[in-house]
Amino acid sequence: MELVLLILVASLIGIAFLALQQHYSYWRRMGVREIRPKWIVGNLMGLLNMRMSPAEFISQLYNHPDAENEPFVGIHVFHKPALLLRDPEMVRNILVKDFAGFSNRYSSSDPKGDPLGSQNIFFLKNPAWKEVRLKLSPFFTGNRLKQMFPLIEEVGASLDAHLRQQPLHNERMRCFDLEAKELCALYTTDVIATVAYGVSANSFTDPKCEFRRHGRSVFEFNLLRAAEFTLVFFLPHLVPFVRFKVVPAEATRFLRKTINYVMSEREKSGQKRNDLIDILIEFRRSTQLAKASGIKDQFVFEGDILVAQAVLFFTAGFESSSSTMAFAMYELAKDTDVQQRLREEIKDALVESGGQVTLKMIESLEFMQMILLEVLRMYPPLPFLDRECTSGRDYSLAPFHKKFVVPKGMPVYIPCYALHMDPQYFPQPRKFLPERFSPENRKLHTPYTYMPFGLGPHGCIGERFGYLQAKVGLVNLLRNHMITTSERTPHRMQLDPKAIITQAKGGIHLRLVRDALGV
């Protein structure tokens, strides 16, 4: 009996071994160059052991010797075969030219357990994504941004006042130290609160206010949160079973209550502010009218689908811009010549505008734009993009591969950070060189190698808004202060291995010196 049991166990182990060997030989059988995976974890060991940031992990795959000179390479995300793109023309095909066959992200959250995370425009799948994107687009037109500008600058002026009120740590040097990311997050939180919701968060006077506290909770990465986001992007089918929420439960309750209250009060008063709340109210009215008229098959804009868009605008809006501003402060602190040139540009523009920060004045800052473009090359908010093949038939990769076709459901990853740091596209990639993005040099860039906000129809809908609030914030910061390094400033930036988005490990500690431009 024991011998029979032993033979049975050995047989089962042997069958499992052969099955795994067959499974993980997928790319060899398809005739596709692969990066050899490890069983169970696939090619994700570098991410799972948290010895490197997601940006560095994706670069390691991109630069792997087995991927050299290949337009794409086969990888495994845990058990599942996936494609990692390396050729800019393939990036164009997947993100733009053949978007219809890759219109969904592979990543997703749990529709039941995480309604505000799963139903926002970032995670929504077609056709719901297309409907929501179409409805939200008017909020980000040039005319809308023009209407928003006074509200953004009002918060910018509060940032300037907040900094001028800070006690000096050294009277002789007229300076004080701070953590740049937190300062910038206070600013962007207040901007989003007033521009999107029509409320004052007052983060500068109360850094622990509910808006800031709940915003922080979404992007505060510990070991558990890191593991959960890894599932969202690489093993999304397991997310419902682990009950992970992109938007934590407490933040969900606060934001749902706040947004529904603001919408209700706005409808009662009839007031119009041309903000996101007005757009969401119009969404709801269109659904109500359609129901009253007996119109069927119209996408339903009500309940959490409305709140989810407001939540995404809040969380993504404050996080990406505050990170960009903080990384810009870090690079400016290390490069005094670039900072001096920028401050001179700001001073000249302020003189031209009579000392007022206006939309025209902000739009005239060409060197500021070059700096932000270079910062976003070095520190893109998301280090990679993900797509899922949604084509009704297998997608051919010709002329890049004559035989292999991408099956429906296969994940595809675009390594933004790795492309940004590839010396064949951006020489001396680790060096901060805003001149890369001068109007003349931009024309020389290889298309589809720069994508800090994504590309194609799925590109970030709030990109122009993000640039605008970052520029207003930096102008008000540099108007009366110069940025320098301190004893706590790292010589080389280290990215947080726990954060799926691009964040500095341990914060960005800098020093501000009182030095008014005199305008």
Swiss-Prot record:
UniProt membrane topology term: Peripheral membrane protein
Xref: Gene3D superfamilies: Cytochrome P450
Pfam families per the UniProt record, alphabetical: p450
Main localisation: endoplasmic reticulum
Gene Ontology, cellular component aspect: endoplasmic reticulum membrane
Function (record text): May be involved in the metabolism of insect hormones and in the breakdown of synthetic insecticides.
Protein name per Swiss-Prot or TrEMBL: Probable cytochrome P450 6g2
Gene of this entry: Cyp6g2
